[in-house]
Amino acid sequence: DTWDLLFYRSLLPGSTLLIGYFILFHYRAMNDFRAIGQPGIVNALFILGSNITFILALANTNVANALVMISLVPLIASIFSFIFLNEKPELITWICSLVCMIAVIFIFYESLSLNQYLGDFYGVICASFVAASLTVMRNNSHINFVPSYILGKLMTALVSLFFVSSFALGLSL
């Protein structure tokens, strides 16, 4: 099930990273979590959004299409950097972006005929969340965003907890 996968895909790395972080940085770990401030909370929400939309993309289209849509992260990040950080990309960046957009439109059009467009849409949204996260981190490079990532993973586990159909792992050894 999609939500079961999302729950474990978030809980296990999130809790492992949390424990590891406190073991490695036990004296300063709490201060690091407090120091993320508003940018860290916003970034954690983007991580939450990207985790959810990634799994929904995989559940609603083929893996290749989902990954192509998610590979748009650099394109979307450059657009966000242009809009929010006032960066001026070079002409070649805009040309490459246009070529990528044409390819994505072609893939999206094909998905419309196969009725798999929802997964492609989730893939683009996922890429947008990741690009937004990168933009926040670039704009606040003085912040340690590892605690923010951990928080985002644990928030994803908490949200997905409400939709889990079974806690059975179904491991076969």
Regions from the language model: what does each represent?
Residues 2, 14-17, 22, 77-78, ...:
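Transmembrane alpha-helical segments that form core, pore/gating elements
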Residues 5, 9, 57, 83-85, ...:
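Hydrophobic/aromatic residues within transmembrane alpha-helices
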Residues 17, 89-109, 126-130, 157:
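Hydrophobic transmembrane alpha-helices of multi-pass small-molecule transport proteins
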